[in-house]
């Protein structure tokens, strides 16, 4: 199945969701998504069927943002290579932002009455011309932070609306991606040399990462600039808190990869196993509890080096595994706020 064919199958849904039209989205999903498709959604949605996607996930978001838009920043389509999986599966990977005027509660997150954004990484597996599996993370903590409702530890990295690729070609990716894929796989292999070898130089970060790289992490971790920002605001605390990380192709862990031109993307449900020890992580005490992690990533290389890396981790599910109900804490923190929708005045009377 060619990237062009996958793109054509997906086009009606992408068009209907761009300026969200509920009827058009329903019609497109009826054609493209198998009713019994397995959809692995981030916490709190969990696993649902294809027939439930709109009612369970999209419709509540649309009610919260009546002028909802789904804006792809990166679009990749193709067949998985023989890297840690059998290869030959047909996937689409999308990175983008849902945006709209936040006028009604969403998952008990209080509305702001203003433009809001929520990053998504959505992966769709096709058999013939229908979606049979989806793996997706929505950056729900990003929406909580914009509402002033995030109930947990402050993030170390910077908060921002994640930008599109600097190169401007995220929706028109072409060419053979084998060199980019080989570089990313080698980079991840070298990352895993530490902390077994306690010298950080064994990761050879300068070999793989551009000196002006941007690491776009999820809300709760934040974004870092350059190798120093990557190390200080994400990787250092991450490895101190969970030094025993294990990646895909180990036991029940598995990733699926796409590569084209200067881009690589990966999805796995789950694709990491870790134990929270050492210093703890993100303000979480070191419980010694093993967790499974889902990390859905996109990389863009420039002159053979990683210039941009978009990462979403299902942090709400991480907290769930550690016994922290983020939504219960959110309700406690915000129960003095007036619930319900925000009626914006007519602009003629503003």
PLM regions and their residue ranges:
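C-terminal and inter-domain tail/linker signature
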Residues: 1-350
């Amino acid at each position: 199945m060619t990237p062009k064919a996958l793109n054509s199958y997906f086009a009606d849904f992408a068009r209907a969701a761009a300026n969200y039209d509920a009827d058009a989205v329903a019609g497109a999903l009826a054609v493209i998504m198998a009713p019994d498709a397995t959809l692995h959604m981030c916490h709190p949605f969990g696993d649902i069927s294809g027939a439930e996607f709109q009612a369970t996930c999209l419709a509540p978001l649309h009610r919260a943002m009546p002028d909802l838009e789904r804006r792809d920043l990166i679009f990749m389509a193709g067949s998985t290579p023989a890297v840690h999986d059998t290869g030959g599966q047909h996937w689409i990977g999308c990175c983008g932002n849902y945006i709209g005027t936040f006028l009604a509660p969403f998952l008990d997150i209080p509305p702001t009455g203003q433009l809001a954004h929520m990053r998504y990484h959505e992966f769709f597996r096709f058999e013939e011309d229908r979606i049979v599996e989806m793996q997706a993370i929505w950056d729900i903590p990003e929406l909580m932070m914009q509402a002033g409702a995030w109930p947990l530890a402050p993030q170390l990295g910077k908060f921002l609306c994640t930008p599109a690729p600097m190169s401007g070609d995220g929706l028109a990716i072409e060419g053979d991606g084998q060199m980019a894929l080989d570089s990313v796989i080698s980079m991840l292999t070298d990352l895993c040399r530490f902390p077994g070898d306690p010298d950080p130089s064994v990761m050879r970060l300068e070999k793989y990462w551009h000196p002006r790289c941007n690491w776009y992490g999820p809300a709760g971790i934040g974004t870092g600039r350059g190798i120093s920002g990557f190390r200080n605001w994400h990787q250092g605390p991450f490895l101190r808190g969970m030094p025993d990380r294990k990646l895909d192709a180990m036991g029940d862990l598995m990733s699926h990869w796409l590569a084209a031109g200067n881009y690589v993307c990966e999805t796995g449900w789950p694709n990491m196993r870790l134990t929270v020890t050492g210093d703890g992580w993100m303000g979480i005490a070191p419980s010694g509890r093993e967790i499974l992690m889902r990390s859905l990533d996109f990389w863009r290389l420039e002159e053979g080096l990683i210039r941009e890396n978009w990462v979403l981790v299902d942090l709400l599910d991480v907290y769930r595994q550690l016994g922290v109900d983020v939504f219960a804490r959110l309700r406690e923190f915000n129960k003095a706020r007036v619930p319900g929708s925000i009626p914006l005045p007519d602009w003629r009377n503003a």
